[in-house]
From Swiss-Prot:
GO CC, alphabetical: plasma membrane; proton-transporting ATP synthase complex
Signal peptide feature range: none
Subcellular location as annotated: Cell inner membrane
Domain of life: Bacteria
PROSITE patterns: ATPASE_ALPHA_BETA (PS00152)
Keywords: ATP synthesis, ATP-binding, Cell inner membrane, Cell membrane, CF(1), Hydrogen ion transport, Ion transport, Membrane, Nucleotide-binding, Translocase, Transport
Organism: Salmonella arizonae (strain ATCC BAA-731 / CDC346-86 / RSK2980)
Name of protein: ATP synthase subunit alpha
Gene that produces this protein: atpA
Length: 513
């Protein structure tokens, strides 16, 4: 059978039409060196700063150094089996983590994968770990409080929603305890919490998670974990991942609280990465951009106005402001707050709570030093009653510290000085508080009112603790409606003052402590 030319041309056309050409462009490179979790790649032409690079075995690295003929990247995860000559590909994507309400009550790693054995995590989408902080026009001033439940903090160093308040002190001074109690106190406040654990022991983190669960606070908390055994890259990225999860709530007109425990370890991890990438070291061998490392993270904690929230949600949420409050923790060495990282973070934040080891060892817990602890914007957010009653507390403590130092040398003191010393000692005793026992605004107000109005003058120093416990039990039993009213309104007027005075007068008459 012979085919004529027309049939041949038709057949060729048919074959051409059916021919399937699949071409996929890959930006591919070759690993030229692997050392301590850092890989150097040759041949990646169009790589972005911070881009995820796909490695063999379903792993990723992040491109941090873009040089003329090679790319320096840090591996997220195990790197022992990576070898010279392996092929890697650009993904064209920046690192993203899952965000949403489904993460609440879960323990996840830096990449948002669950590590609590409770199955997969529900998410409402993904967010880039690096985001630009809201601009000046998008922000609103801080004027609503975040109650930590600690008398010493809420009275003298108040924290507002959208503020960045540093918790700084040596190791074993109660920094994590203060942060965890702040989370426990948000149980019924509607504030969502994110706890980021950086470079800590897995056993310590499991204790924290258990305590949060025991006190019913885990249900509205996301725990992001990068343990000490994980790579420096994951420890460096953990705070940014946690921040992205917190921004989800902030941008939808809700309030969130994030704790970074602690940023000293993140700075050390970043220093390790930078030195391995052969970046020039500066002071204390930290790279030149260690200030920017923390400033770009902490600037993302802000209170955003209703217009920003409305624009972000495309009109779904109207008339609501959102906030992300940050409590970064920094560990000092022998109380040296003038080291490089502490001074950086002090200058970035809106105040600091300074915890001292000698106060902690003397049994004053929380070991807050009121002399150098300050809240630069929290005063505007304090409830009216706390603002009114806490004014004299700081003054009393400042005068007491001054007189205590002076009285060591003076043999005979006049009555006024003796009274001031006695009052200062009692206020110091009154501000002591046990862990996992946060107090409501009404309870704190009542105790501060007793100190302010001289109700402690005839109470022995050793009995201050039992006086406080008996007073709180008395009001819970007989005056619960007033406590509820103060908790809801936070207001202070002559009527409330009269009622508080009446409660204390009748309680003092019982002598039940």
């Amino acid at each position: 059978m012979q085919l004529n030319s027309t049939e041949i041309s038709e057949l060729i056309k048919q074959r051409i039409a059916q021919f399937n050409v699949v071409s996929e462009a890959h930006n591919e490179g070759t690993i030229v060196s692997v050392s301590d979790g850092v890989i150097r790649i040759h041949g990646l032409a169009d790589c972005m700063q911070g881009e995820m690079i796909s490695l063999p075995g379903n792993r990723y690295a992040i491109a941090l150094n873009l040089e003329r003929d090679s790319v320096g990247a840090v591996v997220m995860g195990p790197y022992a089996d990576l070898a010279e000559g392996m092929k890697v590909k650009c993904t064209g994507r920046i690192l993203e983590v899952p965000v949403g309400r489904g993460l609440l009550g879960r323990v996840v790693n830096t990449l948002g994968a669950p590590i609590d054995g409770k199955g997969p995590v529900d998410n409402d989408g993904f967010s880039a770990v690096e985001a630009i902080a809201p601009g000046v026009i998008d922000r609103q001033s801080v004027d609503q409080p975040v109650q930590t439940g600690y008398k010493a903090v809420d009275s003298m160093i108040p924290i507002g929603r959208g503020q960045r308040e540093l918790i700084i002190g040596d190791r074993q001074t109660g920094k994590t305890a203060l942060a965890i109690d702040a989370i426990i106190n948000q149980r019924d406040s509607g504030i969502k919490c994110i706890y980021v654990a950086i470079g800590q022991k897995a056993s310590t983190i499991s204790n924290v998670v258990r305590k949060l669960e025991e006190h019913g606070a885990l249900a509205n908390t996301i725990v992001v974990v990068a343990t000490a055994s994980e790579s420096a890259a994951l420890q460096y990225l953990a705070p940014y991942a946690g921040c992205a999860m917190g921004e989800y709530f902030r941008d939808r007109g809700e309030d969130a609280l994030i704790i970074y425990d602690d940023l000293s370890k993140q700075a050390v991890a970043y220093r390790q990465i930078s030195l391995l990438l052969r970046r020039p070291p500066g002071r204390e061998a930290f790279p030149g951009d260690v200030f920017y490392l923390h400033s770009r993270l902490l600037e993302r904690a802000a209170r955003v106005n209703a217009d920003y929230v409305e624009a972000y949600t495309k009109g779904e949420v109207k008339g609501k402001t959102g906030s992300l409050t940050a409590l970064p923790i920094i560990e000092t060495q022998a109380g040296d707050v003038s080291a490089f990282v502490p001074t950086n973070v002090i200058s970035i934040t809106d105040g600091q709570i300074f915890l001292e080891s000698n106060l902690f060892n003397a049994g004053i817990r929380p070991a807050v030093n009121p002399g150098i602890s300050v809240s630069r914007v929290g005063g505007a957010a304090q409830t009216k009653i706390m603002k009114k009653l806490s004014g004299g507390i700081r003054t009393a403590l400042a005068q007491y510290r001054e007189l205590a130092a002076f009285s060591q040398f003076a043999s005979d003191l006049d009555d006024a000085t003796r009274k001031q010393l006695d009052h200062g000692q009692k206020v110091t005793e009154l501000l002591k508080q046990k862990q996992y026992a946060p107090m409501s605004v009404a309870q704190q107000s009542l105790v501060l009112f007793a100190a302010e109005r001289g109700y402690l003058a005839d109470v022995e120093l050793a009995k201050i603790g039992s006086f406080e416990a008996a007073l709180l039990a008395y009001v819970d039993r007989d005056h619960a409606p007033l406590m509820q009213e103060i908790n809801q309104s936070g207001g202070y007027n002559d009527e409330i003052e009269g009622k508080l005075k009446g409660i204390l007068d009748s309680f003092k008459a019982t002598q039940s402590w």
